[in-house]
Every structure is written in structure tokens, then in C-alpha cells.
Amino acid sequence: MSVVDLSLWEPKTALGRMVKEGKIRTIDEIFANNLLIKEPEIVDILLPGLKQELLNLNLVQRQTHAGERNQFQAVVAVGNEDGYVGVGIGKSRQVRQAIEKATREAKLNITPVRRGCGSWKCSCDEPHSVPFVVSGKSGSVEVTLIPAPKGVGLVAGDVAKVVLRLAGIKDVWTKTRGDTRTTLNFALAVFNALRNTYYFKL
């Protein structure tokens, strides 16, 4: 992940200014107040230990009035492995710029994840799995996350494992429908399922 000198950051939004001035000290405050993150630097400040994983890099063609143009499309996941995760997509004619755009979008899309011990086979009360069965969808792909007891691990495809690990999920069973070979939709379906753990009304 490229290093940004946050001391040189000039916030463009009211939320950004509040974060830089220390009026908002945790990312939890942002979501508790339903505020919208429009600057990735906010995430850099409030989640300094954020990790990044490149999920996919493809060469895609874009039709323009001048003909076809090749671009790189990057899919990136970010997370702190402790209840926050984001997924983003970026396109550019340069690989590095595509990855940077995807990383920026992933930070802007970051969401809290509600974790727990939702399996009836386990009663440890530790946040190692999801607290209940939850689903997410993107395109033709639908992913269902099922609470698993401690020690099961991540029973999921490779792309899903990365997103789940970055969110801080250690044990889960998954069910999938649709074309999971499409990395973008697969990653977004898992991300949407994780996001639904937070917004689901108990």
C-alpha cells in the first residue's frame, strides 16, 4: 500500500476536517452517526493498521469513438482483520494506477462487520464467526455465510477467504450460487454479506 503523508492532507469535507482536528477519534463514531466517508485519508487515520490484498487484475477492452482501448481492471480488498473490510474496483491503462484506484474505492466502501459465535455447536462467545446466517449478492453470484464452531476455519473459495480474513472472520461455512469464477462479483457478494451483518436488524 502506498504511503501517504497525512500531515500534508487538506480535508475537503466537514467529516475530514473533524477527523484531522481530532473531534472524531474512532471510525466507530462515523458509522454510529451514519456519516458518509468521501476521503480515503479518513480511513488511513482511523484505521492505521489496514491491510490490502489484490484479488484480481485483468486486461479489459473499452470501446471508444476512436476504437477499442485496453485497460487494466484491479479488484482490491482492504481490512484490519478486526471487524472492518472494504472491496473496490479500479481501471486504468497503468497497472499501478488501477490498483491505487481500487484501493481508494475499497477504503471509501469500508464497512463494519458484526462478528460473534452464532453456531449452536459452539458456545465460546468469542467473535470468531458470524453471529447468524447472512447472505449477500452481486450480479449472478449469491453467497450465504453460516456460523461455524471454533476450529473449522474458512470453508470457502480462495477469493472469499481473503475477504473474510481481512474482516476478522476465522471460522465460517459458505454456500454459493452463480458463477463464482467472476472474481469481482464473488468478492462483492461476500462483502455485501459481511456488510449485512451490521445493518441487519435483530
Curated annotation (Swiss-Prot):
Q: Which InterPro entries match?
A: Ribosomal_Su5_D2-typ_SF, Ribosomal_uS5, Ribosomal_uS5_arc, Ribosomal_uS5_C, Ribosomal_uS5_euk/arc, Ribosomal_uS5_N, Ribosomal_uS5_N_CS, Ribsml_uS5_D2-typ_fold_subgr
**GO cellular component term, pick one:** cytosolic small ribosomal subunit
Hey, which family's this protein in?
Belongs to the universal ribosomal protein uS5 family.
How it assembles, according to the record, is: Part of the 30S ribosomal subunit. Contacts protein S4.
Q: Highest taxon of the source?
A: Archaea
Q: What is known of its domains?
A: The N-terminal domain interacts with the head of the 30S subunit; the C-terminal domain interacts with the body and contacts protein S4. The interaction surface between S4 and S5 is involved in control of translational fidelity.
What Gene3D superfamilies does the database record attribute to this sequence? Answer: 3.30.160.20, 3.30.230.10
Q: What does this protein do?
A: With S4 and S12 plays an important role in translational accuracy.
Give GO terms: molecular function aspect only: rRNA binding; structural constituent of ribosome
Could you identify this protein by its name?
A: Small ribosomal subunit protein uS5
A Pfam family (short name) is Ribosomal_S5
Matching HAMAP family: Ribosomal_uS5_A
Domain spans labelled S5 DRBM = 50-113
Write the record's keywords in alphabetical order, separated by commas. Ribonucleoprotein, Ribosomal protein, RNA-binding, rRNA-binding
- Its gene is rps5
Q: Which GO terms describe its biological process?
A: translation
